[in-house]
UniProtKB/Swiss-Prot annotation:
Adapter protein complex 2 (AP-2) is a heterotetramer composed of two large adaptins (alpha-type subunit and beta-type subunits), a medium adaptin (mu-type subunit AP50) and a small adaptin (sigma-type subunit AP17). This is AP-2 complex subunit mu. It is a peripheral membrane protein. Brain, heart, lung, liver, testis and spleen. Belongs to the adapter complexes medium subunit family. Disruption phenotype: Mutants display a squat body statue referred to as a dumpy phenotype and have defective HSN neuronal cell migration. AWB sensory neurons show an expanded ciliary membrane phenotype with enhanced wing cilia and relocalized tub-1 and PtdIns(4,5)P2 to the ciliary base. RNAi-mediated knockdown results in impaired function of the AP-2 complex and accumulation of the wntless homolog mig-14 at the cell membrane. One of its GO terms (biological process) is protein localization to non-motile cilium. Residues 174-440 form the MHD domain. It is found in: Cell membrane; Membrane, Coated pit. Keywords: Cell membrane, Coated pit, Endocytosis, Membrane, Protein transport, Transport. CDD domains: AP-2_Mu2_Cterm, AP2_Mu_N. PANTHER family: AP COMPLEX SUBUNIT MU. It comes from Caenorhabditis elegans. GO terms for molecular function: clathrin adaptor activity.
Length: 441
């Protein structure tokens, strides 16, 4: 539980202060200001412990948000709450800065009354909060529109009921559902082409514009394994092996019915309205690496070095990768670079000690290469200290999920309103992007 919550500006002045427990005093305000905000050296850790008191902080622009506690709390829970608190404020009055916090301090205190109860986080969904807290960023002199008994009953049932993330009575002229599978590939490969570490961090992002109170359901691969638990969906071992995905860990939105996921390996949920993140997951097995980077470095003499980098695409020829960028490090004593590339454009950036090679598009099962002749300056200091070659890094975007995650079906059920699954316009998109994608040279 959280003992106190404070919001500071960049000078360390307190903009918002709320103490929830007696074991936290106003002295905590000064302790954080002196030891973190006004510290001589930048404090990199988001958690600071002083006098048996823990300070958890995040920074948005020029605003510091700090949660204080003397209890042994779950750090992940505190940071998740701080993130959602900041997102909630942004959803009400836009950019989170000192001026907006001062202009909306009444609204912020009203939000704190709803999202924290005696230090325990409660409802932090902006969509739900906006049903019973004014949406105006700054309070006006005009009295708010009174809430009827019927509206009050609807608000109460939404906040305390089982479906607190969606209000009733939503109507759209056209029912649409968008699903994006977005994955980030992280790779570290040595000079011989051996994978030292690789993992995929993925998420399922959705946009729902559906009328009424529908139930959505989508199925993923024929076979999925989560933390050693196999959920078979096919009796054919060959088919299951081709479609299998081993997920190390995953996290779902509160709307997902976990019991059905355990039994049917299908995700069933009543969706929130608008944009939301339905699922996060991580996998380290059977990753399809979109690209192979092969660097070759040859030291011709003390004053010259030759570099050749080959990029090979490892996916279907019908697919097209975009936004390719390869960064090739150069020694700090580089005086000049001559470049020859088969495709795209390459440029030497002296300020970054790197050659940046950009390719707009590249089809699958293709390869391209770049050659560079690097001229070096002869300096005693550089010759004495050997240059440790940084890895070659790569950025890209591909239209498939490198983990192999597939959406088998996506259905919508709404028994009360007069529309069926066939009346809903549905879109499914796969996006694979580079995280930290490096090859040692």
């Amino acid at each position: 539980m959280i003992g106190g919550l404070f919001v500071y500006n960049h000078k360390g002045e307190v903009l918002i202060s709320r103490i929830y427990r007696d074991d936290v005093t106003r002295n905590a305000v000064d302790a954080f200001r002196v030891n973190v905000i006004h510290a001589r050296q930048q404090v990199r850790s988001p958690v600071t412990n002083m006098a048996r008191t823990s300070f958890f902080h995040v920074k948005r622009g020029n605003v510091w948000i700090c949660a204080v506690t003397r209890q042994n709390v779950n750090a992940a829970m505190v940071f998740e709450f701080l993130k959602r608190f900041a997102d909630t404020m942004q959803s009400y009055f836009g950019k989170l800065n000192e001026e907006n916090v001062k202009n909306n301090f009444v609204l912020i205190y009203e939000l704190l009354d709803e999202i924290l109860d005696f230090g325990y986080p409660q409802n932090t969904d902006p969509g739900v909060l906006k049903t019973f807290i004014t949406q105006q960023g700054v309070r006006t002199a005009d009295a708010p529109v009174p809430v009827t008994k019927e509206e009050q009953s609807q608000i109460t049932s939404q906040v305390t009921g089982q479906i607190g993330w969606r209000r009733e009575g939503i109507k759209y002229r056209r029912n649409e559902l968008f699903l994006d599978v977005i994955e980030y590939v992280n790779l570290l490969m040595n000079q011989q082409g051996q994978v030292l570490s690789a993992h995929v961090a993925g998420k399922v992002a959705m946009k729902s514009y559906l009328s009424g109170m529908p139930e959505c359901k989508f199925g993923i691969n024929d076979k999925i394994t989560i933390e050693g638990k196999s959920k078979p969906g096919s009796d054919d071992p060959n088919k299951a092996s081709r479609a299998a995905v081993a997920i190390d860990d995953c996290q779902f939105h509160q709307c997902v019915k976990l019991t059905k996921f355990e039994t049917e390996h299908a995700i069933s949920f009543i969706p929130p309205d608008g944009e939301y993140e339905l699922m996060r997951y991580r996998t380290t097995k059977d990753i399809q690496l979109p690209f192979r980077v092969i660097p070759l470095v040859r030291e011709v003499s003390r004053n010259k070095m030759e570099v050749k980098v080959v990029v090979k695409s490892n996916f279907k020829p019908s697919l097209l990768a975009q936004k390719l960028e390869v960064r090739i490090p150069t020694p700090p004593n580089t005086s000049g670079v001559q470049l020859i590339c088969m495709k795209g454009k390459a440029k030497y950036k002296a300020g970054e000690n790197a050659i940046v090679w950009k390719i707009k598009r590249m089809a699958g099962m293709k390869e391209s290469q770049i050659s560079a002749e690097i001229d070096l300056l002869s300096t005693g200091n550089v010759e004495k200290k050997k240059w440790n070659r940084p890895p070659v890094s790569m950025n890209f975007e591909v239209p498939f999920a490198p983990s192999g995650l597939k959406v088998r079906y996506l259905k919508v059920f709404e028994p009360k309103l007069n529309y069926s699954d066939h009346d809903v316009i549905k879109w499914v998109r796969y996006i694979g992007r580079s995280g930290l994608y490096e090859t040692r040279c």
